[in-house]
């Protein structure tokens, strides 16, 4: 099984929160992994996503739970892009262009997403009004449960970066009660720490050229395409039948999808050849069948 080294310069964090001897290697998903993905549902999304990612990683001098959430998302994007050929992007539908009123459908590839790299590695913020120093951290996989609560809540989002033993809600209340300048300073410091995949995509209308900003909701629930066990087994059986290949659970899934494309082309070519033979046979049959006008009837 091949593993690819992830360079720190490619990570949203630039590796600034990992030791210099840390090494992250990743492989694509196998048939076994995609079968496990078939058990995916909303209630177990985080658990299965974490288990699949952990299976596909080789870590040196780094614990899985200490991976930054921004880097986790990058690694999941890598996994999706390099595992799946047919569903490596997101389908965007805009009901109505604001200019020409045309509906827009476009597939956005994952490599179209812009990465916001870390600007500052701050681990404290001094609040002058309270005369205290607030310890800060970058959220990691350990904080994933809390991170699920912060969507559309600015205070909970900021609270995620405070490194104390208080609950997320207690940290949020502390932030809400800060005086103006202390709040501004804390928010500015944390905003400069933030990094990750930029979720706003510019979509161009094919009719009038109008550019529309679309914000994608990217979460564990929609990170991967869910294929049923029945579909997986049917695909493997089909490849075995037409390509005479024995696909095991250790096969990289991307190779299975490539074989599927080859088999589909084989079937298409065979069908086209069959249609040609049928057409040829009909043509020959018609050539040997005398027309009614040329048949001489005996006189009575």
Predicted regions and their residues:
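Short acidic DE-rich linear segments
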Residues: 283-300
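An amphipathic, hydrophobic-aromatic interaction surface with interspersed Lys/Arg
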Residues: 1-92, 96-280
